[in-house]
Amino acid sequence: MERKDFETWLDNISVTFLSLTDLQKNETLDHLISLSGAVQLRHLSNNLETLLKRDFLKLLPLELSFYLLKWLDPQTLLTCCLVSKQWNKVISACTEVWQTACKNLGWQIDDSVQDSLHWKKVYLKAILRMKQLEDHEAFETSSLIGHSARVYALYYKDGLLCTGSDDLSAKLWDVSTGQCVYGIQTHTCAAVKFDEQKLVTGSFDNTVACWEWSSGARTQHFRGHTGAVFSVDYSDELDILVSGSADFAVKVWALSAGTCLNTLTGHTEWVTKVVLQKCKVKSLLHSPGDYILLSADKYEIKIWPIGREINCKCLKTLSVSEDRSICLQPRLHFDGKYIVCSSALGLYQWDFASYDILRVIKTPEVANLALLGFGDVFALLFDNHYLYIMDLRTESLISRWPLPEYRKSKRGSSFLAGERPG
């Protein structure tokens, strides 16, 4: 049949076909299929999938596709990436879904970074690390060798680790290389904290000292405690140093002058931790940006005003038992929003805005875990034998790692958690 005659015939057939009922159309198609050969059936098979299974992700505007993708969980999105190159391209380009996925894993999101592939890679890296945690393959160990006596004090900041020892020295290490950056002669160190220029040490000789890294010289000596100084913190902005001691006292010092500004009393046990931190929420007694002074002993956490008033009164005392039947572990976490401390019953988390207990996370599998670090998604805990990682969303222990042999300190100074930006 000539092409022109065929087109005329096809037009007539089409008009007639459109006039049929659905049942008649179906019978017509069945009859045509029965008359078709292999070439026609293959053609039908190839085109039916396109006609019946529309690729909505390909056909929809990109904005609508992104809106639909936001309803899927990350694991489903990764599966969808395997459907086709087009699906992988669209899904990988949706910045918001990958940022949200990273945020749900506890990642700090920089909204200025809008590279979708960057956030997808971050998520995949985090998932791999989660798998490594579950398989106990996420840790590496290294040793820093240099002290000749017990190491009693640790502090980590920006990839640098400071160690204070009974050998009357403090050393600053580059964690990534294992190299000692500075080594200076000090007194016995029970607590250390440092920045680029200086080192502050609390000592078993009942004093606090400030040292210059570059020269090793002692630039300030703070005398006044009658017991070992177990914890120190300072603020250059306020020009204030605070210290907690075995004499049950917290002292506030002028950092540059070395003079004692105030002595805060009220503790009836060793003060094992002091924290000087900016408030990030509006509380009953503070506003965002205000500096907060916290101190902790075996049973209580106290919140103090930062001032020079004599006989200064504690603003608030937090505890987990009124009869002192439950002890607090010596470590304390405060990020400006929440106070977290461990006890024999589990982790206690207080809301700093109201001072109410938000939750108690119990660890029935392992008792008496000490707190090492507390984040948005994970917490680091340890006992005499293992380091544990807890998923705070499920309140379950997801991994553990054997610790080297050590003598547990009543001050909780045996271990610390490092921090990485982002």
Swiss-Prot record:
Tissue specificity, per the record, is:
Widely expressed during embryogenesis and in adult tissues.
UniProt entry keywords in alphabetical sequence: Acetylation, Repeat, Ubl conjugation pathway, WD repeat
Q: Which residues carry this modification: N6-acetyllysine?
A: 298
Q: Where is the F-box domain?
A: 54-101
| InterPro entries, alphabetized | F-box-like_dom_sf, F-box_dom, FBXW2, G-protein_beta_WD-40_rep, WD40/YVTN_repeat-like_dom_sf, WD40_repeat_CS, WD40_repeat_dom_sf, WD40_rpt
Identify the SMART domains for this entry: FBOX (SM00256), WD40 (SM00320)
Q: What stretch or stretches form a coiled coil here?
A: none
Its domain of life reads Eukaryota
- Report each WD repeat as a residue range: 146-183, 185-221, 224-265, 276-314
Q: Record's Gene Ontology CC terms?
A: cytoplasm
* Subunit comment: Directly interacts with SKP1 and CUL1.
Role played: Substrate-recognition component of the SCF (SKP1-CUL1-F-box protein)-type E3 ubiquitin ligase complex.
This chain belongs to the protein called: F-box/WD repeat-containing protein 2
Report the source organism. Answer: Mus musculus
